[in-house]
Regions:
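Conserved AMP-binding
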Residues: 83, 104-110, 117, 133
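ATP phosphate-binding P-loop of adenylate-forming
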Residues: 50-68, 79, 83-86, 218
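Conserved helix-loop functional segments at active or binding sites
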Residues: 34-38, 81-91, 170, 206
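Active-site "substrate specificity/gating" loop of NAD(P)-dependent dehydrogenases
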Residues: 67, 75, 113
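Conserved pre-ATP/AMP-binding loop-to-beta segment of ANL
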Residues: 15, 33-57, 64, 89-100
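Structural detector for helix-capping/boundary residues
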Residues: 27-30, 50, 72-73, 105, ...
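Conserved adenylate-forming
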Residues: 4-24, 95-97, 116, 123, ...
């Protein structure tokens, strides 16, 4: 109910499963699925891998923001590429077959809209939308949500990891809930300092007795988004990993960089 109250959905129809929401026009999911409509069937039948799924704006880090055409085939194949690097049997063993994430990354950016949303859809997991953020005003909400939801994966930006590291070090209750089911951590959007990594792992070892993989990768809005990934336990930040299955990289000299 709190999640719905935080959205501007007055006058919108809410489709629900479980407890009926308060104060909204709502229909149960089972009833919704039993209501036939040829329009939906027709629209679905016209979808192909080359059908445009969305126009995603770039962040402007390399110039003026521009609209990137993301096709259904792009976003679907990228989600499957990422899934292919997991040991699914081992993951199911660790998580009980249920993926859970609590995330604040906006769907107006490829990281949240693709790497988070589409991957959780592909897993058939549960995504809790976090109204918090790593800012002074919204950090308390982010921490409260992470105390309520014990996630199996946590992916966010370095600024959030920096804030979270401090709170994990001083709040044992938060640390216990955060690491209770966690099997994988990841960061993206910017580089992350080695010191932040070491602080997070120190808490992980104190709570669980072992380190938990904290990975990163390389991608862009145009690649929808992940092109490479570090998908093994690692102790060094700043790596991008090898290309995901189906991708090919070409290294091009650029001044003192590759």
């Amino acid at each position: 109910q709190r999640a719905l109250d935080g959205l501007d959905i007055e006058g919108r129809l809410v489709i629900y499963s479980g407890n009926a929401p308060e104060r909204y026009d709502a229909v149960r999911f089972e009833q919704f699925m039993r209501s036939p409509t040829l329009a939906v069937d027709g629209a679905y039948a016209r979808l192909t891998p080359d059908t445009v799924a969305k126009y995603m704006m770039t962040s402007g880090s390399t110039g003026e923001p521009k609209a990137v055409i993301n096709l259904h085939g792009m976003v679907a194949s990228n989600a499957r590429m990422i899934r292919s690097i997991w040991d699914e049997d081992r993951l199911d063993e660790l998580t009980g077959g249920t993926q859970v994430m609590c995330n604040f990354l906006p769907w107006s950016h490829t990281y949240g809209a693709h790497s988070i949303l589409h991957n959780m859809l592909d897993w058939g997991g549960t995504l809790y939308i976090d109204q918090g953020a790593p800012t002074p005003a919204r950090l308390p909400e982010m921490l409260r949500n992470l105390k309520e939801v014990s996630t199996t994966q946590h992916t966010t930006v370095p600024a959030a990891w920096a804030a979270l590291a401090t709170e994990l070090e001083r709040d044992d209750q938060l640390a216990e809930v955060f690491f209770k089911r966690l099997v994988c951590m990841a960061y993206g959007g910017a580089s992350m300092g080695q010191d932040i990594y070491e602080r997070i792992q120190a808490v992980a070892v104190r709570i669980t007795g072992e380190r938990i993989s904290l990975s990163a990768g390389y991608g862009a809005t145009e690649t929808a988004p992940t092109a490479s990934n570090v998908h093994w336990p690692n102790d060094r930040m700043g790596l991008i990993g090898p290309p995901l299955p189906g991708n090919t990289f070409k290294m091009v000299p650029n001044a003192e960089k590759m």
